[in-house]
Amino acid sequence: MEKDRARRPLFELDEVPQAAKIKVIGLGGGGGNAVSRMMAAQFTGVDFIVANTDMQALRASPAPVKIQLGAKLTQGLGAGSNPDVGRNAALEDPETITRLLEGADMVFITAGLGGGTGTGSAPVVASLAKDLGILTIAVVTKPFTFEGRRRMLQAEAGMDALRNVVDTLIAIPNQRLLSVVDRGTPLLEAFKVADTVLQQAVQGISDLILVPGLVNLDFADVRTIMSGMGMAMMGTGVGKGEHRALDAAQKAVASPLLDDTSIEGAKGILINFTGGADLSIHEVEEGARIVQEAAHEEANIIFGAVIDPSLGDEVRMTVIATGFSEKKTQTEPSGKVVDLPRAARQAPAAAPAGSTAPAWRRKYESRGDLDDPLAENDYDVPTFLRRSAD
């Protein structure tokens, strides 16, 4: 008896899941395409769901879980680009959606806004997820200008509805893809690039939780930065050479693809560096300082680092910035759409006195740390998109 008591542990640890449960639900045609691309890229560690009013699109999806929205309302024929139909279709059977979302710690909602199903159903699905206490993040695209004013207005209305029911909203304007793809890029390829951007946004966040790190980030860290934060900015960058971490940081905070937001003024920031075994603390500090100087002085910054030998001499940085003031996110002007080949041939104009360039850029320009290889028209474009444009 005494021996048995002596062998007993002084305390017992309750078993807990090793990782947060993450689900990705693609709504409508755009969201479904994004899920297909994520699966083709062998994006693992998450559960995929697609939901659509169009039965033909559902049958073609490789997703293991499929939801037909509005079977009675639309007869499987789609929403006819009418968001009201998309909304009512999602409301036809909310119990099924809720059942398939249950058990998740985090849900990503992906959709292309402007049409019927994605625009109308996304706020409904987000509201159901929030009712379950799930951290809910929407990653959506906005239409190209050539898709017409009505589609853009519907997208803006969808954005407004989503803002009220998600924890974090990341919006990617398709129009800005014109600044990072070649003029001869076929239309279908341009839409594929939009799907890739959605994939990068979702994977950039989920990897922070799912991939073990030298300095670990976990679901609690991500929840701290993204819960109830509204509009967000997410950027990724890859650097090589002597100032590779600095290079990666500059690319990550200067993405031209994210909707009317920059890192300046952010009050919540999550940073993740990934590099080979030779990644040094001084490199990480140099890159993180770029982000720190651009953010709000009282920003809550959470940092993680992952060793991935497959990267070789490259360093990859992911930054997620949240907590922007409403005034900033609503009034900051959109970036110009430029012809990339033409822009690449032109030297950037000198900044006028009292320039409003980001603090990190002014500082490093004054120190001479920004060499020609990091000129603005180059480092503003994420590496994976430059490769797509080549």
Model-derived regions, located:
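Tubulin/FtsZ superfamily GTPase core signature
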Residues: 1-390
